Amino acid sequence: MSKKEKYIFSVVIPVYNAEKYLSETVDSVIAQDIGFEKHIQIILVDDGSKDRSEELCLKYREKYPDNIVYISKENGGVSSARNQGIPYIEGRYVNFLDSDDKWESDVFSKVYRFFEKTYDRIDLAACRMRFFEARTDYHPLDFRFKNRNDRIINILNEENCIQMHVTSCFIKAEAVRKWTFNEEQNYGEDTVYISRIIMDRGRYGVVTKAVCNYRKRGNDSSAVQGMRGKKKWYIETPDQFYGELIRFSMERYGTVIRYLQQLLVYDLQYRVGFGYNHVLNKEEFETYRQTVHKYLSYVDNSCIIRSKTLTMDDKIRMLSFKEGSLNREQLSLRDNIVMYQDSALVNLADRGATLMVNFLSVENDTLILEGCIRTWILSCWPELQLKYVVDEQKYYPAVFNDYDIEKKETLTGDEWQLRFYRVRIPLSGKQQQIYPMIELGNGEECRMKMVFTKFMPLNALNPGAVCFRGKYFIRYAANAIDVRIPSNAMKTKIAYEIKAFNYLRKNERMDAAKLRIQAVCRRFFKKKQIWLISDRDYVANDNGEHLFRYICEHRKEYPDVEPYFVISGESPDYERM
């Protein structure tokens, strides 16, 4: 390290009314196995907090006076706070950590080893982002880390490997000092900052086993709505975000490189997928709509098609918005693959999110399947017919309902995400294999992959997930529903209960296995039906709550029902419910 580099790492933490989480964040840095007091500096920048944040900051500074710098300033936003901390940096590598996120304890040592091997080749290294609290999975861009080895990504060769967040990055201090955060920008300011660093160098590193825990709060949706309730998000942010990066790419490369096009696709999907907001008048909204279209026009269609994060609904919507309407003449189906302008959109035989089966029942020796199909495929082929095939010989057409569900307001207009269908299939008593197929207007056929929703007793992964409907035994096998009347129903039930138990045990789900055993035992005793009712796991106050309250208030009408409302213990509605 040079004389200016007193530490290996400097961590800049902007603080604003963060008393609830700040200790977790700071403690995660102090706990680093590389050694905090010798190798790490923390710069706490209080951006005019009105809670106990300053008190906490001062306590940490008092405890670690050689490692912690405390700066107090008037409220000016997160970019202002980050910029204020930059002159105090004394580390070789810098992390801008949000005041409610935290690092795993071995991250800094892993990042240090990686940087020391690649110092002359990169300016920035990114780590994995794992959500916690209201959501517990990894960031949609986590596919970049599927390779187990740390590596350097050349952005001209791996256009899909975009980096959006600064909090999960470590940046060389000399690169940090070359740039500043735009203090007038309230959304995407960190993406602009790191994108200039990445595009300037043309590559960046990924440390595959270093994990940043990114807090996803249950009220994040309300924060997003708050952002969308401000005119600035519509009128100023697009130019500050997309316009700035396009200008930078043109100056650096003479073109809008495909890496940046993928970044535009990733962020613009949320704007194209979000329709009219009454914060704008009609004229302002039309201007905003044209602005979004202008920036989407910098994106080649193939970037939309090849995106690894867009759903098919997103791809069709963005292509339609960009071109004015979907050019159906450029759509084709080749070996179950949907093609658009000779680029592959999706393999219908592999992808499971197009056709869903929601309910299964048997009435009068007739199997009734009810489900839904995603409407993007109907927008591609309005004349499409859905049918279920039995034993490769007989076809039974599905009947679509007159109504769709999941209405979504978008820049292309109102969309209905799903269309319901029902199909009735006569049962013979002999073994029958049943699977769905679509037929296009030109006679082309494609076998569809089924997805069973939460109300279905079948499961594609668990071989023990089967059901009886009267005398009929029903299971899932080889992307088909298998129906038959077993010669010994009890023997069949026991065999598949054992399979279900072994599957759960193999996958270390003994908690679920025990519940399964209890459920089997309870069948031999008279009991009430247990109804589990819910809205979302973190929020109540919707149709589920109203149904639950109705049943509770009319218990005499439901004497054999024991209702329970399911909700997270961390939900703000938990105590009320």
Where are these regions (language model features)?
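Active-site and donor-binding regions of nucleotide-sugar-utilizing enzymes
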Residues: 369, 406-411, 435-437, 520-521, ...
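Catalytic core of nucleotide-sugar-dependent glycosyltransferases
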Residues: 214-218, 224-254, 270, 276-301
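Surface-exposed amphipathic alpha-helices with a cationic face
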Residues: 76, 246, 552-556
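Surface-exposed loop/edge segments in extracytoplasmic proteins
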Residues: 137-142, 392-399, 573
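Nucleotide-sugar donor-binding/catalytic module of glycosyltransferases
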Residues: 1-244, 264, 513
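Basic, ligand-binding patches in group-transfer machinery
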Residues: 278-281, 286-530, 553
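P-loop NTPase catalytic cores that bind/hydrolyze ATP
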Residues: 243, 255-278, 372-373, 434
